[in-house]
Design a protein with these regions (language model features):
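Structured, active/binding-site neighborhoods that engage oxygen-rich ligands
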Residues: 1-313
Length: 313
């Protein structure tokens, strides 16, 4: 199939990339999108020229869990037993949630219970109380919004998709929850390795069967709240595909309405990898809001991942 051919082409490009310098801090696209959309999540705007970062803008649970997955991925041994990998991920996510409370919004009901009240979990497979934290068959967009680091860290598509599945299934083990996480990670992987928008679209369509042909203008007129992967990820990718630069991608994602911070978080993560440039004022805003722990995660990502040539700071 065509996506298999594309996969091979883009994997071959990795050898021409170089490791970024330790001073580089990157992977801010997801964070900036989250912050930009934070005030519009429950007060949607359809105005493309909305105010960027109005008073009250801040990072949300989307950023907290993005950083948790990034921190885990850099410590994780992908060759370890599955339960070892998921146990480390669980520890990292819970630790991050406890020690870095999100200043805006909160966690979705099921995920909040999983994080803070595992004793209340019901194992959906048996209908009985769970003896420990377990996945809850969610197809929510939380699995997709937290996976951007995975698109940056690995040298081949197969590993990228496998790790994205691990990051999703600890909570979101519904097929759509897994697919959403993998699609976002794959799009970032392709974008950072020089794939064109046409190629990214063709790969995602063939591999994940998302409809990416819906005109953005139609979404702008008709789209509303949807917190599922299948109702968020395609729309976020379309916002990227129809954009002209990083900022226009964020504006397109937010101005269709819906789950604005998550849409822009996903769109921003792909747009950064593709455009390899972020406006300085957006970088400054994000860096002024995130805690030291997040900055350290970003610095570590710069040491372990591939990135574009020009430092954004």
């Amino acid at each position: 199939m065509k996506f298999l051919i594309s996969e091979a082409i883009y994997e071959n490009k990795i050898s021409s990339l170089h490791k970024i310098q330790k001073s580089t801090i990157y992977m801010l696209g997801a964070i900036i999108g989250d912050i930009a959309g934070s005030v519009y999540e429950f007060s949607n705007t359809k105005d493309y020229n909305f105010e960027m970062f109005p008073p009250g803008s801040n990072f949300t649970d989307d950023t907290v869990m993005t950083m948790a997955v990034a921190e885990w991925a850099m410590k994780n041994d992908i060759n370890a037993e599955a339960d070892v990998q998921t146990h480390l991920l669980e520890e990292t996510m819970v630790d991050m949630a406890i020690n870095v409370p999100c200043p805006m919004g909160g966690y979705g009901g099921g995920f909040h219970t999983w994080l803070f009240h595992p004793e209340r979990l019901i194992d959906y497979r048996t209908g009985k109380s769970a003896s420990a934290r377990c996945p809850y068959n969610s197809c929510g967009n939380g699995s997709a919004m937290r996976t951007s680091a995975i698109g940056w860290l690995y040298g081949d598509m197969e590993t990228t998709l496998r790790v994205a599945e691990t990051a999703a299934t600890i909570t979101h083990n519904h097929p759509e929850g897994i697919k959403g996480a993998q699609a976002v990670s794959a799009a970032i992987f392709l974008a950072r390795n020089g794939a064109s928008k046409v190629d990214i679209k063709e790969f995602i369509t063939a591999k994940f069967h998302y409809n990416l042909d819906t005109p953005w203008e139609y979404l702008h007129k008709t789209y509303g709240w949807n917190s599922s992967c299948q109702g968020t990820v395609p729309q976020a990718i379309i916002s990227f595909l129809t954009s002209d630069d990083f900022e226009s991608a964020i504006r397109r994602a937010i101005s269709i309405g819906g789950d604005s911070d998550t849409l822009a978080c996903i769109t921003g993560s792909i747009a950064e990898a593709y455009y390899k440039s972020i406006p300085e004022y957006m970088v400054e805003k994000a860096m002024s809001l995130i805690p030291v722990r997040f900055k350290k995660v970003l610095e570590m990502m710069g040491e372990k991942g591939y990135c574009y040539d020009k430092n954004i700071l």
